């Protein structure tokens, strides 16, 4: 898996590859690893599919209960804290690496990384999954804060594409979600389409 | 109270005319307790209560009945002191649990709701008795100032001005005269002192001490005791008013 999220000028963008494996077998080549938690908060999932789907479902439920009980939308920080608490308290049973990102009018866009142990890190750019190991250098060299939407989409597309080329557990297509004051927009990149995946190897 | 003496007040169950006597007795316990008031003003909340000094051996200003529950929450209780301490402890547990789960301060409306629900439980079981306290919850959060009063049966309402205890009637009359939407914290401290002095029992000249805390803009959103200097100034003001009123009454005679 390769998952990424970043803060850009107007909000946040999440991106992920689409490969799910069972050992060497590709169980799904068009997986959606970007999961909606609330209207304006999404997460990227990496690790065990069963574990992360369950954690995401529970998060979704708790956050909707929060809205019902307390009469306002939970902040991105609240969603991320809740996610990290669940991952931390159950660390012995879980294999889940999450990135929680969202946009709200009060704080703007925020990205939180929740790696394996359940710790919580607020970051301008977060990368995760097995594929991320191959793109730390690329991200260090090319990431800038306050990018335009076009720059940010291009950066994430290249980052995920590079990881997909080198990581055997990443591949398939690239999915993105853009969150800003105008709401949500999805992007999809695949070979032999109008929105192709960039190729770097020769 | 026709059902008294028929056994319906010996447990937490309804009498034939639909009353919970144990819950009603809890109110009686608070009615004779020391006066406690809360004022919600434009930029914060004031909690104030009056303590009868029962012994000269007691150290002044240390036996507090208003507790801090979180950075932005204060709770004053009047009635059974141990019950009040238990309520404050419970509120602290709720506040820390919220912080653990959501990584943010617990909203005022939520802490009041949680306490109300907790207190209500003690009107449901035969193995426990209801709390003999009124709890004043003062908070200041992103939504602004809040003041709630939780009653012994679990009911809680939001208030601009609230009073409980022996002098509640006098205090409520005085509170009704305040203009809460324009009142500032520093002025509210003076008003709180004045109101507590106005509730003083004339014949009963026991030693009294005023405990006062506040939370709001003036304190950067942190619940803390009103500084000694300001409290003394407010008490001096209250004493002057109290003396002045006495003169007015004398002149009318």
Curated annotation (Swiss-Prot), chain B:
The keyword Protease does not apply. SUPFAM superfamilies: N-terminal nucleophile aminohydrolases (Ntn hydrolases). The modification Phosphoserine is found at residue 104. It is found in: Cytoplasm; Nucleus. Keywords: Cytoplasm, Nucleus, Phosphoprotein, Proteasome. It comes from the Eukaryota. InterPro entries: Ntn_hydrolases_N, Proteasome_alpha, Proteasome_alpha-type, Proteasome_asu_N, Proteasome_sua/b. Belongs to the peptidase T1A family. This is Probable proteasome subunit alpha type-7. The lineage of its organism: Eukaryota, Fungi, Dikarya, Ascomycota, Taphrinomycotina. The gene is pre10.
């Amino acid at each position: 898996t390769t998952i990424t999220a970043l803060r850009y000028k107007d909000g946040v963008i999440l991106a992920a590859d689409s490969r799910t494996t069972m050992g060497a077998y590709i169980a799904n080549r068009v997986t959606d690893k970007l999961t909606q938690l609330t209207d304006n908060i999404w997460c990227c999932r990496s690790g065990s599919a069963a574990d992360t789907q369950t954690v995401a479902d529970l998060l979704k439920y708790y956050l909707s209960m929060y809205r019902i009980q307390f009469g306002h939308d939970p902040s991105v920080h609240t969603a991320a804290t809740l996610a990290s608490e669940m991952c931390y308290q159950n660390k012995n049973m879980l294999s889940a690496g999450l990135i929680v990102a969202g946009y709200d009018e009060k704080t703007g866009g925020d990205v939180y990384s929740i790696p394996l142990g359940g710790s919580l890190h607020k970051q301008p750019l977060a990368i995760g999954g097995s594929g991320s190991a191959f793109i730390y250098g690329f991200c260090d060299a090319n990431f800038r804060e306050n990018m335009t939407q076009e720059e940010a989409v291009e950066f994430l597309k290249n980052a995920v594409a590079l990881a997909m080329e080198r990581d055997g557990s990443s591949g398939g297509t690239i999915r993105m979600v853009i969150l800003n004051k105008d709401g949500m927009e999805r992007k999809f990149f695949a070979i032999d389409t109008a929105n192709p995946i960039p190729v770097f190897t020769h | 109270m026709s059902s008294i003496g028929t056994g319906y007040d010996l447990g937490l169950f309804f009498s034939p005319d639909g009353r919970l006597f144990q819950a009603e007795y809890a109110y009686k316990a608070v009615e004779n307790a020391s006066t406690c008031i809360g004022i919600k003003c434009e930029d914060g909340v004031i909690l104030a209560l009056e303590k009868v000094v029962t012994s000269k051996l007691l150290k002044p200003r240390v036996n507090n009945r208003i507790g801090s529950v979180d950075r932005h929450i204060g709770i004053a209780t009047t009635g059974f002191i141990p019950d009040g301490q238990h309520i404050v402890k419970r509120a602290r547990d709720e506040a820390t649990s919220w912080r653990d789960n959501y990584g943010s301060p617990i909203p005022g409306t939520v802490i009041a709701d949680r306490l109300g629900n907790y207190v209500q439980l003690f009107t449901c079981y035969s193995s426990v008795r209801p709390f003999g306290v009124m709890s004043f919850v003062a908070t200041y959060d992103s939504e602004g100032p809040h003041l709630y009063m939780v009653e012994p049966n679990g009911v809680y309402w939001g208030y601009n001005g609230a009073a409980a205890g022996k002098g509640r009637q006098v205090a409520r009359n005085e509170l009704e005269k305040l203009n809460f939407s324009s009142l500032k914290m520093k002025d509210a401290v003076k008003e709180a002192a004045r109101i507590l002095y106005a509730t003083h029992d004339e014949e009963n000249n026991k030693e009294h001490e005023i405990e006062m805390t506040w939370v709001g803009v003036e304190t950067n959103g942190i619940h803390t005791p009103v500084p000694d200097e300001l409290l003394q100034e407010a008490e001096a003001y209250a004493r002057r008013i109290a003396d002045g009123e006495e003169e007015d009454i004398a002149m009318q005679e």
